[in-house]
Amino acid sequence: MFTSKSNSVSPSPSLEQADSDALDISTKVQLYGVLWKRPFGRPSAKWSRRFFIIKESFLLYYSESEKKSFETNKYFNIHPKGVIPLGGCLVEPKEEPSMPYAMKISHQDFHGNILLAAESEFEQTQWLEMLQESGKVTWKNAQLGEAMIKSLEAQGLQLAKEKQEYLDKLMEETEELCLQREQREELERLNQVLEAEKQQFEEVVQELRMEQEQIKRELELTARCLKGVEQEKKELRHLTESLQQTLEELSIEKKKTLEMLEENENHLQTLANQSEQPPPSGGLHSNLRQIEEKMQQLLEEKLLAEKRMKENEERSRALEEEREFYSSQSQALQNSLQELTAEKQQAERELKAEVKVRMDLERRLREAEGALRSLEQGLNSKVRNKEKEERMRADVSHLKRFFEECIRNAELEAKMPVIMKNSVYIHKAATRRIKSCRFHRRRSSTSWNDMKPSQSFMTSQLDANNMEELKEVAKRLSRDQRFRESIYHIMATQPGAPSALSRGGK
């Protein structure tokens, strides 16, 4: 019954580019081809072939011979055999006894159903799809579509405006967040610097404690030397007294010997006058010479003892000054140790405070980033409701509070130059104090170098080397820029800092 032809159904010109270019825009159709049609309005089993065209939302049909004219002229006849409006129609496949690829078109305003049939399943599917699509075009849908388009355009403009505003805010907040992230990285770097300075403080405190122990040992050695010198002074005093007593005895003996020599000479002279033989007097002269030699020896020993006493007195005085010097140095080291301990505790408190501030800043950053992500999701979401708008307003309020706090912190940081200026003044005063201390220590060192070294100095060369090493460490620390800046910061935060610091930090 079927006489199928491959060109019985032609696709829409929108599917064939060559045909669409050749047609006039007013004559373009969606689909055309030959279908089987059963008579409308009355029951009949007869099927006839007709040439059908789908134009917009209408189905036009002609006699089968019209197909050749349409394909030749590319214009359809404006006088069809019939026109079927497809708007609101229900199109569905249906199987008939003699037509397995039939299609039923029904509408509530139609007095019956319209039955059409294709010659293959492919043609049936193609016509069903195009008929169903054309059935969606109605006057009501057109009016509703125009109103919906206008409403969507207005909503789109409003959403685009809001999106642009939120994007501007988002860019500003992103820049602020980048600035906060940079500040957080700077805080981490400062934390590392503070950790290094804390380590330096601990090393300096340990060195000062070792130096204090060394000075204590030196003081004990000096005290022992002082005791030895005092004992030696006592022994020399006793020796001097003994020598003085011996000299006095020898003087008395010499005087007696001289008196005896004088008597002998007088006696010899008397005997000479009487022409008598003189007795020998050599023993007395030899005795006198021995006494004189012994007196000379005793005088030399006395001078030597006096010289040693003077040396001991000088050593005693030097040891006493040395003891006072080490006592002052020990007291200075003790004060420095206490100050460094206090500074270390202050630095630890500041470090803990900075860590706490950093943790609070990180928490606020996380909250701000979460609010920012939520706001971005709300902006990118196509579904808008009251709950999402309230959540977006809450996120915007949270970000507003966050950036207001950032502005207040920036205002506080703007006052930092005044504090730095005051810290420079404190640095100059501290430099003058350090120079004064170094000058006094240099003078004391010069006086010590001019003085004859004592036994304790002679036996403590290693301690002097330790002192020189400590001086070198102090010089290196004084040349360390970060160390000085941390010291100035600690001095600026001390309760005894100048009032200008407190005014600058308000």
Curated annotation (Swiss-Prot):
It comes from the Eukaryota. Residues 28-136 form the PH domain. Residues 146-391 form a coiled coil. Pfam families: PH. InterPro entries: PH-like_dom_sf (IPR011993), PH_domain (IPR001849). Keywords: Coiled coil, Methylation. The modification Omega-N-methylarginine is found at R503. Belongs to the PLEKHD1 family. This is Pleckstrin homology domain-containing family D member 1. It comes from Homo sapiens (Human).
